[in-house]
Amino acid sequence: MSSGVQGGPAAHANAYQTHPLRDAASALGTLSPQAYVDVVSAAQRNFLERMSQLASEQCDAQPAAHDARLDDKPALRAPQERDAPPLGASDTGSRASGAAKLTELLGVLMSVISASSLDELKQRSDIWNQMSKAAQDNLSRLSDAFQRATDEAKAAADAAEQAAAAAKQAGADAKAADAAVDAAQKQYDDAVKQGLPDDRLQSLKAALEQARQQAGDAHGRADALQADATKKLDAASALATQARACEQQVDDAVNQATQQYGASASLRTPQSPRLSGAAELTAVLGKLQELISSGNVKELESKQKLFTEMQAKREAELQKKSDEYQAQVKKAEEMQKTMGCIGKIVGWVITAVSFAAAAFTGGASLALAAVGLALAVGDEISRATTGVSFMDKLMQPVMDAILKPLMEMISSLITKALVACGVDQQKAELAGAILGAVVTGVALVAAAFVGASAVKAVASKVIDAMAGQLTKLMDSAIGKMLVQLIEKFSEKSGLQALGSRTATAMTRMRRAIGVEAKEDGMLLANRFEKAGTVMNVGNQVSQAAGGIVVGVERAKAMGLLADVKEAMYDIKLLGDLLKQAVDAFAEHNRVLAQLMQQMSDAGEMQTSTGKLILRNARAV
């Protein structure tokens, strides 16, 4: 029972499962193809050696100890009867005959294997010799061609050198001939100056002509030899280039032969076993991935280089457009300042003309001059305090529609008030015009600070208030007393004398320039007024022209600004394109990596399935 229990599990196991080489056989499924071939070849050699050893032992009538087998297991014997003779004693001859036959069979097998190996080796040797002979013939042919090309190039170089030496000598002869011509010419000129006889002059002239002929021939030979030398030099250069090409062909052939016959493992060693379909497909896809990745990298580099160059160009154009825009804006500002200065100069000239006209009219022209002076001073004060020039806002339409009526009304009211106070009519008109101009200038300065739209309203309110107050003042007793006080004050303070001196000065000025009659004064005043009007019109025209020029420059600046914005958009677009190229590159690599991962997973699954099938097959 104990023996049955001990051998219970092993009793039901077959011989394959308990064989000692079972683990070694299981390891065959994990070997590489080359290792598998090596293992099988070694096992075959060991088997043949073992069989030869057993055959020789049996031929020598020396049976193996304990009937040893190939796997070192005891030999199994068929059951025999107790009285039966031993099987070995009766079959000695048959054993010897079987061993001899096995030895003969092994010898034939080894001879066949050796013969096939020798035939294959001989065949490969013949192929090798033929290929070597072809390569040797090709190298010999290329070497001969290179030698011929070298010899021809050397001969051409020697010929070119000789031709160059001949051309150099011919050039020297030509220079010597030119020197002889110069000497003959000098002798002839000296003879002419000395007044030598005609026969002497004729001989010298003939010698000069002969020297010129020889010099021409020498120059012709020198030119011909120089052309021949140039031609031979070109031929030598062409042959040298051809020789270098032959040398390059020889070098390429030698390198190719060295690479082909120095590492021709396919002709000397058996080919490695082919891969399976899935493995080969995986290898092909791996190469494909490498090629695509390399192509993607090169494409990305080329796009990046292109976009970088385009961005650099657009940035340069943008900088140029920006500089042009700044120049146009600066030019427009300078033009505007220039036209403003011109307008101010013309305005001062008009003011001076108005003052000149005041000497002849004593009324409206002086008032205009005072208004111009007040406006000029007010313009400077306003520009210094607020930075705004109301002279640019209040031009001719304001003068015609507001200033003149306002000034005339204020002057009329003041003149009437002064006449009512007992002042002389002429002096009252002069003072009224001056005071009206001053009041109008003050009102306009205030209007410039308040706003141009309120000029008429402020002026009308000032006029109404002044008229009402003056009327009330003249009707009241205080007004009458004020008139008397003004008369006395004027007498005491010398205002009447001041007015008389002013009138006298104006009269002297009119006489000094030849204006005696009132009509002459009016004529000159009209002329000054016309001149002022013409200058005013010219000022307006120049200001308008300056405004047009400034507008044109600003339009050019706006065009440049549009180009700058367009260039900025192009740079942004190039950046977006470069980003898209990088994203596409990353997406391609991701797809390829995913594909290779799927192929690797499929190959791993196939390998796992094969291993599982082999395990199940061994377990049978």
UniProtKB/Swiss-Prot annotation:
What Gene3D superfamilies does the annotation carry? Answer: Nucleotidyltransferases domain 2 (1.20.120.330)
Which source organism does the UniProt entry give?
Burkholderia pseudomallei (strain 1710b)
Q: What is this protein called?
A: Translocator protein BipB
Q: Would I find Transmembrane helix among this entry's keywords? A: yes
Q: Which domain of life is it from?
A: Bacteria
What does this protein's UniProt record list under function? Plays a role in the bacterium-induced formation of multinucleated giant cell (MNGC), which is formed after host cell fusion, as well as in the intercellular spreading of bacteria and in the induction of apoptosis in macrophages. May act in concert with other effector proteins to induce fusion of host cell membranes.
Q: Where is the composition biased (Basic and acidic residues)?
A: 66-84
| GO cellular component entries | extracellular region; host cell membrane; membrane
Q: Where are the transmembrane segments?
A: 355-375, 401-421, 430-450
- The chain's coiled-coil residues are 309-339
Could you list this entry's UniProt keywords, alphabetically sorted. Coiled coil, Host membrane, Membrane, Secreted, Transmembrane, Transmembrane helix, Virulence
A Gene Ontology biological process term: symbiont-mediated disruption of host phagosome
